[in-house]
Swiss-Prot record:
It comes from the Eukaryota. Residues 1-16 form the signal peptide. Expressed in nasal mucosa (at protein level). Specifically detected in septal and lateral nasal glands. The keyword Secreted applies. One of its GO terms (molecular function) is small molecule binding. Belongs to the calycin superfamily. Lipocalin family. May form a heterodimer with OBP1B. SUPFAM superfamilies: Lipocalins (SSF50814). This is Odorant-binding protein 1a. It is found in: Secreted.
Length: 163
């Protein structure tokens, strides 16, 4: 019983640390056109919110289309595996947290667009620019997921949308 309570407490603390204000620092994708400036999956995150014991995760972000920042909130629904969330945005999306530190959260996502094309993505959220060590770790993770390191885009410096 004690192990179960410790596990539940740890799970709750991890999700509590995940909630709050976060900004997209970098994005990687195997279809790099989707994350270039003006790309439909180049999102500028603002916050994560867990609801219903984190069975629902709300992600609030901006997309910048034609020079206009549009605020969007999506809700991801936790799937039976207890790790993956599913939502709709520019097609069907499945995403999960793959790395976590006090400074950054890294999510792996797969998007299947309306033309039935699959895109693998990594999003790293944080509060400031990545260190050299963090960049290297992100590049290694991208390669592990089948995303060329050359397809990483640092987006924090291009985020001109409102806070």
């Amino acid at each position: 019983m004690a192990k179960f309570l410790l596990l539940a407490l740890t799970f709750g603390l991890a999700h509590a640390a995940m909630e709050g204000p976060w900004k997209t620092v970098a994005i990687a994708a195997d279809r790099v056109d989707k994350i270039e400036r003006g790309g439909e999956l180049r999102i500028y995150c603002r916050s994560l919110t867990c609801e219903k014991e984190c069975k629902e995760m709300k992600v609030t972000f901006y997309v910048n289309e034609n020079g206009q920042c549009s605020l969007t909130t999506i809700t991801g629904y936790l799937q039976e595996d207890g790790k993956t969330y599913k939502t709709q945005f520019q097609g069907n999306n499945r995403y999960k947290l793959v790395d976590e530190s006090p400074e950054n959260l890294t999510f792996y996502s797969e998007n299947v667009d309306r033309a039935d094309r699959k895109t693998k993505l990594l999003f790293i959220l944080g509060h400031g620019p990545l260190t050299s060590e963090q960049k290297e770790k992100f590049a290694e993770l991208a390669e592990e997921k089948g995303i060329p390191a050359g397809n990483i885009r640092e987006v924090l410096i291009t985020d001109y949308c409102p806070e």
